[in-house]
Curated annotation (Swiss-Prot):
GO terms for molecular function: DNA binding. It is found in: Cytoplasm, Nucleoid. PANTHER family: NUCLEOID-ASSOCIATED PROTEIN YBAB (PTHR33449:SF1). Keywords: Cytoplasm, DNA-binding. Binds to DNA and alters its conformation. May be involved in regulation of gene expression, nucleoid organization and DNA protection. It comes from Streptomyces coelicolor (strain ATCC BAA-471 / A3(2) / M145). Its main location: cytoplasm. The keyword Cytoplasm applies. This is Nucleoid-associated protein SCO3619.
Length: 115
């Protein structure tokens, strides 16, 4: 309902929905191009992912490589990738959160949004 008791203008609502859809698509494209980093072991292992969570790079400092202890290296790689993905999720919330609120939700239940 519109203040004053009038009915909502369907054309206006449709235009608003189309604009929100375009804004969402633009933000998702921007996220796919943006890269964020995560690290573990004090920077011995660094992972780079896109804002949408795609792993793009992994850098391992030679100091982290111990042939006798590959398990620790594996743990550092997992931790770095998880940190990068957490940073990507934070970026997603920054970019897409305001759009989700504009669609009447707090970010929950909207297809394509991970939060």
């Amino acid at each position: 309902m519109i203040p004053g008791g009038g009915q909502p203008n369907m054309q206006q609502l449709l235009q608003q929905a189309q604009k929100m859809q375009q804004d969402l698509a633009k933000a998702q494209e921007e996220l796919a191009r943006t890269e964020v980093d995560g690290q573990a072991g004090g920077g011995l292992v660094k992972a780079t992912v896109t804002g949408s969570g795609e792993l793009r790079g992994l850098v391992i400092d030679p100091k982290a490589v111990d042939p006798e202890d590959t398990e620790t290296l594996a743990d550092l790689v997992v931790a770095a990738v998880q940190a990068a993905n957490e940073n990507a999720q934070n970026l997603q919330q920054q970019k897409l959160g305001p759009l989700a609120q504009g669609m009447g939700g707090g970010g929950s239940g909207i297809p394509g949004l991970p939060f």
